[in-house]
Amino acid sequence: HAILAPEEYTFGRLFHQAVDGSPANPGNTVLVMASNGHSSTSLAGGTKLSRATNVGLAGVLTDGRLRDFDELAAEPFAAWCSGEAVAWGGAVVTPFQANIPVVIEGVGIYPGQYIFCDSSGAVVIPDSDIDEVLETAHQVRADDSASRDLIAREGRNEGLTRER
């Protein structure tokens, strides 16, 4: 095991390096943390991640676990992880670097890449595809809205014969 200088490898220090190194508006930024094989270990919790609120991040994404779901649910940012941990993870993992490529669930993620997350999960969108993906997403949203309007107006028997 390597000995790391504790004052250099702190969550707070590397959190701010990651956020300050992002060219995007913090409100459009997701902090991505790789567990590097420790996916059952807590990488952070409500106290450490309160920094995300302080700087206005949109969310946090990790393949590891997070703690304090009740606290995180009250925060204005979204959090995606592999599950909730009870125990503090600092005895197992320590932050090491910021603004480097990481691998989450077999997917390479590079600083500045587009990530879309919702309650179903997260998707990394290649830079070369962003315009097409956004255009398609807007069309899907419009189609869904039109379908909801149609469903809201349908009669009782109509709903039995229509696909949606």
What is the predicted function of each stretch?
Residues 115:
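C-terminal binding/interaction regions
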Residues 121-123:
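Channel- or pocket-lining gating/hinge segments that regulate access to a cavity or pore
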